[in-house]
Amino acid sequence: FFLLLFATCSFAGNRGKEQPKYLWFDAEANFERFASKDSISYYLEKAKSVGFNQVVVDVKPIYGEVLYKSKILPPLTTVNGKVIHRDWDYLQYFINEARRLGLKVTVSTAMFPSGHPATNEGLVYEESRWDGKTCLEYTPDGKMLDIREDKKKVGAFLNPVRKDVRKFALSIVREIVKNYDVDAYALDYCRYPGDDSDFSADSHKAFEHYLGKKVRNFPDNIFTWNADGTKNPGVYYKEWWAFRANVITSFVKEVRKEIHSINNKVELEYWAASWIHGIYGQGQNWAS
């Protein structure tokens, strides 16, 4: 289904301005639909005709491959068994047509997912350099599981606490902002995959640095799993959630600094969870 998100935003003090009306073009859902330029033009014209004034172009879904000309990442050519090779620049064509129609453009990328566990497709399944850099899950049976092996997860997330992962993600942002004339950059999946991640040695060490002291009996001192799948809080339970929120918010600050160092007119946007029960598990509990 091509229309995945409609959002209107209202800001105090801007009553004299036209309010943004966004239409989000998801990369995966529209992979086959937008195999041709004509189709992109058709839907952008439709969007304009019904009152939208800004479009969000998703160019890096959960696979870690992309729909723009990149020197960092390979092109996305296969989704759900459908193979499409484009000899034209998907993102640039969206921008050109949007400008023709007077539409603003937000570009969106999935920040930390780089593979699809259900099908073993994507960057982290194809390149060994990502071994040990994906999230490590602490499962209800008390075991540790590489997220690449968890078929239930929406994406195989890289570990956001790692400096090399953050540097890699920032390089993607930098490449797009330098090479494409966009109005805004939206961070999608800029979070943890869930409350069972990440329990790697990297996160253990970073958590100790955050607290300023050693954390023994990890992860039991964070929490243990009860037989019914609920959690039994440990000594550092609350500190753990605050730490994870800080991992994400500090990265968002880095992205903002990077974008504005290149072009301070490009706005930073963020696809945030609206479900209150999920924000702690995903590191989006900013009030912490």
Report the location of each language-model feature.
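Active-site-adjacent "subsite" loops/lids of carbohydrate-active enzymes
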Residues: 17-34, 106-179, 229, 233
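Glycine-rich, aromatic-flanked loop segments that form ligand/cofactor-binding clefts
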Residues: 52-59, 63, 90-148, 186-189, ...
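Aromatic-lined carbohydrate-binding/catalytic grooves of carbohydrate-active enzymes
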Residues: 50-86
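Conserved, mostly hydrophobic/aromatic
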Residues: 47, 55, 98, 169, ...
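Aromatic- and glycine-enriched glycan-recognition loops and surfaces
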Residues: 32-50, 77-101, 167-171, 246-253
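Aromatic-lined carbohydrate-recognition surfaces of secreted/lumenal glycan-active proteins
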Residues: 104-114, 186-193, 226, 237-287
